[in-house]
């Protein structure tokens, strides 16, 4: 793997009886890296680091006890084959932080904190499963496996489903929870990530909305609906014209969507007034701070 202009990272499986200490010099590494460095003299190679990793795939049984939550590597360990280990920890933090803030400022009920594990655990399990299978496809099978990899991997990008999961790093949708309301339709926006396209004013959606909720609609809401949303700190964005947001709503077969601070779609539908009314049952106007239930 190329890192920057002049650094490369190589990974090799250690055989029985071998350790990283056996490969502490360029000379010792030569047989392994020769296919990529045959024309490079030893004097032009600088060995920066040799280290040994043990890859694990683990998920904690419980992610919450009272007001104590675990996240990141404390909650799950992901093999590195799809580069999603750190990303999973960031998703944990993004999923949990705004919920705690909402409970503290009174806009969310304390029991929504249970949705952290309900949403993140199945998602993490899916990503670990994918990483394990990608790892097996990259390293298993001996000589036959090597032959299959040479034939198949260059063509992965031609298969839409695999390309989205492996090459484009498309993340699975979250399951239903107190803060993800899905319909029975097989393809829908609820639980998926909202895009971050440029808006007509030049800003991107994330910059315009900040760390709050967003109500994205193809037509402006009525005065009463807009006032209801504003009282709950929800930004209103109208996706009109030939914009990426309007195309996104159209592909999701809906006219409006309510998007969470972590940019997950909470709910979407064709009736924006009904969606506003539903939002009012989940989000409350700011009130006195409260503590999560023990």
Language-model segments: which ranges?
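Helical substrate-recognition/capping region of FAD-dependent monooxygenase/halogenase enzymes
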Residues: 35, 103-294
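Short gly/ser/thr-rich secondary-structure transition/capping motifs
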Residues: 50-56, 195-200
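Conserved FAD/dinucleotide-binding core of flavoprotein oxidoreductases
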Residues: 1-50
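Catalytic cores of eukaryotic secretory-pathway lumenal/extracellular enzymes that build
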Residues: 81-83, 87, 94, 113, ...
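Glycine-rich phosphate/pyrophosphate-binding beta-alpha loops
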Residues: 76-87, 137-140
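Short FAD-binding loop at a beta-strand-to-alpha-helix junction that anchors the flavin cofactor
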Residues: 64-80
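Hydrophobic alpha-helical bundles that form the membrane domains of multi-pass transporters
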Residues: 68-73, 88-95
